[in-house]
Amino acid sequence: MATSSIRSRALGLSRRARFETTRLPFIGRRYKSDETLNRISSKITQPKSQGASQAMLYATGLTEEDMSKAQVGISSVWFEGNPCNMHLNDLSGIVRDSVLRAGLVPMRFNSVGVSDGISMGTAGMRYSLQSRELIADGIETVMNAQWYDANISLPGCDKNMPGVLMAMGRTNRPSIMVYGGSIKPGCSAKGQKLDLVSAFQSYGQFITGQIDETERFDIIRNACPGKGACGGMYTANTLATAIETMGMTVPGSSSCPADDPKKLVECENIGEVVKNMLREEIKPRDVMTRQAFENAMIVVNVLGGSTNAVLHLIAIADSVGIKLTIDDFQAVSDKTPFLADLKPSGKYLMNDLYSIGGTPALLKYLLKEGLIDGSGITVTGKTMKENVASWPDFPADQDIIQPLSNPIKPSGHLQILRGSLAPGGSVGKITGKEGLRFEGTAKCYDYEDAFIESLERGEIKKGEKTVVIIRYEGPKGGPGMPEMLKPSAAIMGAGLGQDVALLTDGRFSGGSHGFLIGHIVPEAMEGGPIALARDGDRIVIDAEEKVVDLDVPTEELDARRKQWKAPPLRYQKGTLKKYCALVSDASHGCVTDGPI
């Protein structure tokens, strides 16, 4: 079958010819499969009343025997304009052939995507979080309208992962994710290991005179050497690892680099995996249980993962009918040590973790230490514990994952803070390297670029304790809750990490580090206290007490509230206008179909 499929492609034969490479026994005017795997697609391929449906399918190249086979929707978030996604069409072709070899009918389709790295710091970033909903809605639409029996999704960039998982949760048909993989590290002319965050931080270094133009250009020219998602424990790798932990990928998918031959092997073998899922009726809601989400939250904290995991795991849980809250994250963070010396706060990249065994070795270690539960079923049909049992242990001399006896921080870095500035909650990314308490005077900016301009003018001084507030960047105010990587990277690049805390109703990239508090609820557009803060106000952030307070008398805040007026929405037409009308707040995952 494999040889026949390769020969068919080489000769440039039609899709119909490729489908004809394997035939089932002919019985009368029907072809019969030895298994009934087409439980969904049979609704259109079998009834005489659906003859027009069948005529259309014959036109796509299906044969008579194909009408009795299960149909697998292969959804790729491929587009050329992003290294995270540019190779996914090639991978989906390998997946298609694998599905064909398994005796199933592959049906490829595509979804939209946004490059967070390219759109970062621009109005384009307002479309990023909203693309998660478009991906989920698009895959759900095609899977249901086309009556596909199973789904294989190939995501690459940040919002791709939660988008495809939300669609899987909604449709609840046998589904599996194949992660596109991480990019290799870049290298500067001086031999310095680089990644995308190096490029973002180079601007702060440049405007403060730490590097010249030649050095700046060397960094941006060499930071991203090819295909794959951003290489640190940023949002894409955080989500991919969490999803593998939940059991929705084959072992090793999240840590295997984009250009590693094993990524091709993963795609070549995926057809039999999904066939077994169809046979055993393993569905997303069987895999993504509350315990699976508990495991995912633990692993995110162990790895020092992105704050976006809070938003996205809440939304994925919502899609399978599980109510996950920001308080669940705090409960996990309180009992989970931070162990991984990975960027952005550490020095290693995902490729380095892969070199010592990757995600399966990490899960095996955490199982041995009793931090996670390995009893849940996964897409392989086995439990997590069974999946990793034969996987090699971490080498004894590795220093990427610290032992439990010597954690980087004894509790998690994700902190849920409430207080007079964020009564509905906020999410802090506090590794401990920047301290656990910050007190300073507010400098308020109503949009991201206003802060960058202020930094360029030298208005943020080293030695002064400043709390930068960037507001009207929430789900409705942004809209789309854009990420503040450009400001946070500029702060760190300018050497102001110990002098500045950054608060926002927007989000932070997984590449951000420093004293950062985002996801502030209520957002400024809704009249939350963040909208009432003024330059010179005293702000107190205490990670141990889990508070973020605006130290202004109640009477003064009441007076300011009476004077406050909501600004007009930035978009009065189009997809972002619709998004503003539907989106929930950050504490409820920014879902658009109503939180459970």
UniProtKB/Swiss-Prot annotation:
It comes from the Eukaryota. Pathway: Amino-acid biosynthesis; L-isoleucine biosynthesis; L-isoleucine from 2-oxobutanoate: step 3/4; Amino-acid biosynthesis; L-valine biosynthesis; L-valine from pyruvate: step 3/4. DHAD activity is not inhibited by the dihydroxyacid dehydratase inhibitor aspterric acid (AA). It is found in: Mitochondrion. The keyword Magnesium applies. It catalyses: (2R)-2,3-dihydroxy-3-methylbutanoate = 3-methyl-2-oxobutanoate + H2O; (2R,3R)-2,3-dihydroxy-3-methylpentanoate = (S)-3-methyl-2-oxopentanoate + H2O. Mg(2+) binds at residues 116, 158, 483. The active site is at 509 (proton acceptor). Residues 1-18 form a transit peptide. One of its GO terms (cellular component) is mitochondrion. Keywords: 2Fe-2S, Amino-acid biosynthesis, Branched-chain amino acid biosynthesis, Iron, Iron-sulfur, Lyase, Magnesium, Metal-binding, Mitochondrion, Transit peptide. PANTHER family: DIHYDROXY-ACID DEHYDRATASE DAD, DIHYDROXY-ACID DEHYDRATASE, MITOCHONDRIAL. Dihydroxyacid dehydratase; part of the gene cluster that mediates the biosynthesis of the sesquiterpenoid aspterric acid (AA), an inhibitor of dihydroxy-acid dehydratase (DHAD) effective as an herbicide. Performs the third step in the common pathway leading to biosynthesis of branched-chain amino acids. This is Dihydroxy-acid dehydratase pbrD, mitochondrial. It comes from Penicillium brasilianum.
